């Protein structure tokens, strides 16, 4: 009996609890939120209710439900915030301004399969952010400010298959971030990824079925080779991977480039230099702007947009009535929308917003209106390679959702006013390879969101003022390979350009004031292949490029005229060489390069838009510098060699026993003279034969001074000679003069050897006499002092001159016989000053 009562009590309590649970759930749906049951799943809609915490809600305990909390004020999620929500399978937390998720906030959500965190303010995904979500399969965190993901953020999400992280601020992905997950769909569009390594990232997503990598600033250099190699080996769907840098590859699809394009130096040194002819042809068509051999007035047929890779499963299901449904229908939160595609075109859809990529290239369309039926919500429209001649005003009225419009390589010569007015969301416009001649302002009305404008390879001759004023977000403008000769004032004043291509036009000079000074400081500009006239008019451009806040010049400005400067780089020319008559001339005052940055404008410039400064020296300049150094080295060596040879020839050969040199080293020559040959100086016994350096007489006045290496003579006082009047009456008398000289070329006639004495003590000896012939001599005493070798060497030239041109002061004439009648008298006379001066002049001329 007692047991029966107990059993009835338990049943009563259970019934009461079940009734209360149903009553509470009913009350939540009636009072606070809107509840709707679909396919046995309860949808609890609590959107825009102003909730600041989920603790105010009492979810049902015995039913599976989807909870929609979008548009509330849940800025922070604290630990155990959802501990009572164990039956939730879907949780929407979008548009809450959510900034922080504390560790353990999702504890208790063991059955949760889908989590939506889109459109919040999250910055970091930590390792403990998703604790408790072991059953999670779908994670959407797009449109946040996520810049950092820790390596173990997804390590506990072993069942995760779809990860949506588009439109965040990711610069890179950490190593092994996907190691413990089996992703099939990955969306990384609209981040700031430049490279993606294979090791640690790509190697862990081998089961991927779809990967979205568009709208990232991919740096197409050697660092991107791992991603390129991985893309070449997979067969899954891959969106467009468009190069942002370097400048030469901007706008090119990575999947259509070769290893040689990405890494020229590395490919040239390895085995990857081999290419298929198909790839070469396709790349050449894809990159018309980089081929200098093309006619600047008309481009070849443009390349096709990159073809999408085939997926293992159909991306778009098209029925007979051409209606299709978007991809990943299993994971969509909204009901699928029927999509239509024009006939003769191929359409693929965008995964995030069901937009279409419409590919209608080379279909022989003559008008855009020929596209029937109209595509539903097109995002990208490719009409390249058709026969379009005019873009009419009403052609694009139903294409307001376009993000990209490609009209390249048609025959477009006319764009009617207002043709693009409805394209308020368009960011990329391709008009390259057409027949446009004039650009005017109304041509681009309505394109306030435009960021990239391609106008290369037209026949543009004129740009009207204010043409680009409405393009306030324009960042890239390609005007290369046209026929432009000038630009109007303030043409770039209303833009936010970071890249400008004016290559291969007809510019001879560009004004700074009103044109170039309107550009921001960090712009990259290409001015090559223009006929620059390097005269005074180009001084403004030179000053602008050399300014402290100067832009990055892609390729140097090369002069074409005048002829003396043809082929020279403007930067290396001096101001005097360019404008010799006025080297200080400049094109107005160089205004601040940050002129446009002061204008209030909400621009988001990625780090890749800032130029990279390269300090590499051009190869031609390096070779020229080395050649100049080599020539200077050869000239210096030759000059040094000649100098050494001259020094060696100029050093005289001095005997080792120079200190013991005696008068015996002098050559004694005999010369006959007639005493009556000169009437003016008959009494002078010298015909001005300069004495040698050595001491010629023992008289103290002829002795050299101590330390003086040059011999000198005292004033002439005594001069001995015969009676002049008696000599005139006598027949010609032969006389011999004994002198020590090294420069007389005429030798005396042979005579019997006479004895000459080197010592005054030997004067007592008699010389042989023959009648009236007598001898005049000077005794040569031995030297009492000989200059050192060093002093003789240092003053050798001066000594030689003294020997040749020294003026004699005094000399003795010895008597031949004391009983000679003509020599008994010893008259003395002073020499004539004019005679001495005349003889000195004559000798100096010799």
From Swiss-Prot:
Keywords: Cell membrane, Cell projection, Disulfide bond, Glycoprotein, Leucine-rich repeat, Membrane, Phosphoprotein, Repeat, Signal, Transmembrane, Transmembrane helix. Residues 167-215 are annotated as: Required for interaction with PTPRD. It is a single-pass type I membrane protein. Pfam families: LRR_8. InterPro entries: Cys-rich_flank_reg_C, Leu-rich_rpt, Leu-rich_rpt_typical-subtyp, LRR_dom_sf, LRRNT. Residues 22-622 are extracellular. Residues 332-374 form the LRRNT domain. Disulfide bonds join 29-35, 33-46, 220-243, 222-263. Changing residue 167 to A: Abolishes interaction with PTPRD. Abolishes synapse assembly. Changing residue 187 to A: Abolishes interaction with PTPRD. Abolishes synapse assembly. Disruption phenotype: Conditional knockout of the gene causes impaired long-term memory and abnormal gait. Excitatory neuronal development is abnormal in the mutant animals as evidenced by a reduction of excitatory synaptic puncta in the hippocampus. Hippocampal CA1 pyramidal cell-targeted knockout of the gene results in impaired synapse maintenance and abnormal retention of spatial reference memory. Residues 267-276, 285-300 have a biased composition (Low complexity). In the adult, significant expression is detected only in the brain. Broadly expressed in embryonic brain with highest expression in ventricular layer, subventricular zone, cortical plate, pyramidal layer of hippocampus, subicular neuroepithelium, thalamus, hypothalamus and spinal cord. One of its GO terms (cellular component) is plasma membrane. The keyword Cell membrane applies. Belongs to the SLITRK family. Interacts with PTPRD; this interaction is PTPRD splicing-dependent and may induce pre-synaptic differentiation. Interacts with NTRK2. This is SLIT and NTRK-like protein 2. The lineage of its organism: Eukaryota, Metazoa, Chordata, Craniata, Vertebrata. The gene is Slitrk2.
């Amino acid at each position: 009996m007692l047991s029966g009562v107990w059993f009835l009590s338990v049943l009563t309590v259970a019934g009461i609890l079940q009734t209360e649970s149903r009553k509470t759930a009913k009350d939540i749906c009636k009072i606070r939120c809107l509840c709707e049951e679909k396919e046995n799943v309860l949808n609890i809609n609590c959107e825009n209710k102003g909730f600041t915490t989920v603790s105010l809600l009492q979810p049902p305990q015995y039913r599976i439900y989807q909870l929609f909390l979008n548009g509330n004020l849940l800025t922070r999620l604290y630990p155990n915030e959802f501990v009572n929500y164990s039956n939730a399978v879907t949780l929407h937390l979008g548009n809450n301004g959510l900034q922080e998720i504390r560790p353990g906030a999702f504890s208790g959500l063991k059955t949760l399969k889908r989590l939506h965190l889109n459109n919040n303010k999250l910055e970091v995904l930590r390792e403990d952010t998703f604790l408790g979500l072991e059953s999670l399969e779908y994670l959407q965190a797009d449109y946040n400010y996520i810049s950092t993901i820790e390596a173990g953020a997804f390590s506990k999400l072993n069942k995760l298959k779809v990860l949506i992280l588009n439109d965040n601020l990711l610069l890179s992905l950490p190593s092994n971030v996907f190691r413990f997950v089996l992703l099939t769909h990955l969306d990384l569009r609209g981040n700031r990824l430049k490279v993606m390594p294979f090791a640690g990232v790509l190697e862990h997503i081998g089961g991927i079925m779809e990967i979205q990598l568009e709208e990232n600033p991919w740096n197409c250099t050697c660092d991107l080779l791992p991603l390129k190699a991985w893309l070449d080996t997979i067969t899954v769907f891959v969106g467009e991977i468009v190069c942002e840098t370097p400048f030469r590859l901007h706008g090119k699809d990575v999947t259509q480039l070769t290893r040689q394009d990405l890494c020229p130096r590395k490919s040239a040194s390895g085995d990857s230099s081999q290419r298929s002819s198909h790839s070469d042809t396709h790349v050449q068509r894809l990159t018309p702007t980089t081929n200098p051999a093309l006619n600047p007035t008309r481009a070849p047929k443009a390349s096709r947009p990159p073809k999408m890779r085939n997926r293992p499963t159909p991306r778009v299901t098209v029925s007979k009535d051409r209606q299709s449904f978007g991809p990943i229908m299993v994971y969509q939160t909204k009901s699928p929308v029927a999509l239509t595609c024009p006939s003769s075109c191929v359409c693929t859809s965008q995964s995030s917003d069901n937009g279409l990529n419409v590919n209608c290239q080379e279909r022989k369309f003559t008008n855009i209106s020929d596209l029937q039926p109209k595509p539903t919500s097109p995002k990208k429209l490719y009409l390249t390679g058709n026969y379009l001649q005019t873009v009419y005003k009403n052609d694009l009225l139903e294409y307001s959702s376009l993000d990209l419009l490609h009209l390249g390589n048609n025959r477009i010569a006319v764009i009617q006013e207002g043709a693009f007015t409805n394209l308020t969301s368009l960011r990329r416009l391709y008009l390259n390879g057409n027949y446009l001649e004039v650009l005017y302002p109304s041509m681009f009305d309505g394109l306030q969101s435009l960021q990239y404008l391609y106008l290369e390879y037209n026949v543009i001759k004129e740009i009207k003022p204010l043409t680009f004023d409405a393009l306030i977000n324009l960042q890239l403008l390609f005007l290369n390979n046209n026929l432009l000769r000038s630009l109007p004032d303030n043409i770039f004043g209303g833009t936010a350009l970071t890249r400008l291509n004016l290559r291969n036009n007809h510019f001879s000079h560009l004004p700074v004031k009103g044109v170039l000074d309107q550009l921001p400081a960090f712009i990259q500009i290409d001015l090559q292949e223009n006929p620059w006239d390097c005269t005074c008019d180009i001084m403004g451009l030179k000053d602008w490029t050399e300014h402290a806040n100067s832009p990055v010049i892609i390729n140097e400005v090369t002069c074409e005229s005048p002829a003396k400067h043809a082929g020279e780089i403007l930067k290396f020319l001096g101001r005097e060489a360019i404008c010799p008559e006025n080297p200080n001339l400049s094109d107005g005052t160089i205004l601040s390069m940050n002129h446009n940055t002061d204008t209030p404008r909400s621009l988001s410039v990625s780090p890749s838009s800032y130029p990279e400064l390269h300090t590499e020296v051009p190869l031609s300049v390096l070779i020229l510098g080395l050649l100049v150094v080599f020539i200077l080295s050869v000239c210096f060596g030759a000059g040094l060699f000649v100098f050494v040879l001259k020094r060696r020839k100029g050093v005289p050969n001095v005997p080792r026993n120079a200190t013991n040199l005696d008068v015996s080293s002098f050559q004694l020559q005999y010369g006959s003279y007639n005493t009556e040959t000169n009437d003016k100086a008959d009494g002078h016994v010298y015909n001005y034969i300069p004495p040698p350096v050595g001491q010629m007489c023992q008289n103290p006045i002829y002795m050299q001074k101590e330390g003086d290496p040059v011999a000198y003579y005292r004033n002439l006082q005594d001069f001995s000679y015969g009676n002049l009047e008696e000599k005139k009456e006598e027949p010609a008398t032969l006389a011999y003069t004994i002198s020590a000289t090294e420069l007389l070329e005429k030798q005396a006639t042979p005579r019997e050897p006479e004895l000459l004495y080197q010592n005054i003590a030997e004067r007592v000896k008699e010389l042989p006499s023959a009648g009236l012939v007598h001898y005049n001599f000077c005794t040569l005493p031995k030297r009492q002092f000989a200059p050192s070798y060093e002093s003789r060497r240092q003053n050798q030239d001066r000594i030689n001159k003294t020997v040749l041109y020294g003026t004699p002061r005094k000399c003795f004439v010895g008597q031949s016989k004391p009983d000679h009648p003509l020599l008994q008298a010893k008259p003395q006379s002073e020499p004539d000053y004019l005679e001495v001066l005349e003889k000195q002049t004559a000798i100096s001329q010799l």
